[in-house]
A protein has these predicted regions:
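Structural signature of transmembrane alpha-helix termini at the membrane-water interface
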Residues: 26-27, 148-151, 218
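Active-site recognition of the HExxH zinc-binding catalytic motif
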Residues: 138-151, 198
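Long, well-structured alpha-helical subdomains associated
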Residues: 16, 23-24, 33-37, 43-44, ...
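Enriched but not universal
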Residues: 1-15, 312-317
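Post-HEXXH active-site segment of zinc metalloproteases
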Residues: 134, 150-184
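Short pre-active-site segment immediately N-terminal to the catalytic Zn-binding motif
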Residues: 124-140
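Auxiliary, metal-adjacent structural segments of Zn-dependent hydrolase domains
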Residues: 18-121, 132
Length: 317
């Protein structure tokens, strides 16, 4: 049974959430009650994450053959707990990988296949990964972090991490031909707390890959501005700022405003909508700032200088 202080702390945390995050929690198919799983591991990275991703990456390229023809450009492989001997926090008995060789697909954790076994590990974790992606390891870290979050929730009795078709998440990620609807979806997606955790894990992987090129604070800034996380937030924030600069047409403004109201069940006007979106993005960027110095210290050869504060927000705001 949980200590009284734990329950109090969880309730305080839930009450501190803004309406957007509460709305998300109420629309996903999990029990809505105080739950400390939202906090998860510090920085969204658990011990063993990088080693697990590296082992998976190595296995993919051991199995892949440049001379073999693959049906529909895909192949599948399975790894077992014993394949990760010596790596901490292996939370599954089996890891099933669906590997796509095309350049147009992304990566995803397929959570509906994850169920707890008698030993309290997932029987099987399924991840879809595209080996056409640059720096595959960081995407593996991203999806493994989602799987780990799911495992943590199910250990604590949360029903599912998988979301209903009619959930807010599904509405956010619904494919669309409208460019600004896609932008809106990306903004809402990037500011989900679960995604921010995963991007922290991904950013950690990106930093490790470039650590040998970092010799000064200027090198660090240049490197960080090339990461997917920085470029993604920069692009989205710039589009929102175009509204403030009167660079969006009425049609573009109406598309974003109407779609945002539809998804969130609100009736905001255009000014309120763009102010809300900008606030969401800036809040997420500041959260990345809070952990970036720690990540730089852990992942880069920079013990002899201090990581500049507010790295992301200094260059984005």
């Amino acid at each position: 049974m949980k200590e009284l202080n734990d329950l109090i702390n969880e309730q305080v945390y839930i009450e501190s959430l803004d309406d957007f995050d509460k709305h998300i929690l109420q629309h996903i198919s999990i029990e809505y009650r105080p739950k400390s799983w939202i906090l998860l591991e510090k920085f969204g990275i658990y011990p063993g994450l990088e080693e697990t991703a590296n082992a998976v990456y190595s296995k993919i390229y051991q199995e892949y053959s440049f001379t073999k023809e693959y049906k529909a450009g895909k192949f599948e492989l399975t790894m077992y707990k014993k394949d990760f001997e010596g790596i901490p926090n292996i939370f599954f008995e089996k890891l099933h990988l669906k590997v796509d060789l095309t350049k147009d697909s992304g990566s995803s954790y397929v959570g509906n296949f994850s169920t707890l076994g008698d030993n309290m590990l997932f029987d099987c974790v399924t991840i879809e990964i595209n080996v056409g992606l640059v720096e595959v390891e960081k995407y593996l870290m991203h999806e493994l972090l989602h799987a780990y979050q799911d495992w943590q929730m199910q250990l604590k009795g949360i029903k599912r991490f998988v979301l209903d078709r009619d959930s807010l998440y599904s509405k956010i990620m619904k494919p669309t031909k409208q460019y600004y609807e896609t932008v809106l979806s990306a903004i809402l997606y990037y500011t989900l707390k679960s995604e921010l955790n995963a991007y922290c894990a991904q950013l950690s992987g990106e930093l490790k890959m470039i650590k040998d090129t970092i010799e000064s604070p200027n090198d660090m800034v240049k490197a960080l501005k090339q990461t997917d996380s920085y470029r993604g937030y920069s692009l989205l924030l710039n589009i929102v700022n175009r509204y403030d600069r009167n660079e969006l047409s009425k049609e573009e403004i109406d598309i974003v405003t109407n779609k945002c109201n539809e998804i969130l069940n609100k009736s905001r006007n255009a000014e309120e909508t763009f102010k809300f979106l900008k606030k969401r993005l800036e809040s997420s960027i500041r959260k990345l700032d809070n952990i970036i110095g720690k990540l730089c210290t852990e992942n880069l050869n920079c013990s002899y200088f201090t990581a500049p504060s507010n790295l992301f927000s200094n260059y984005l705001f």
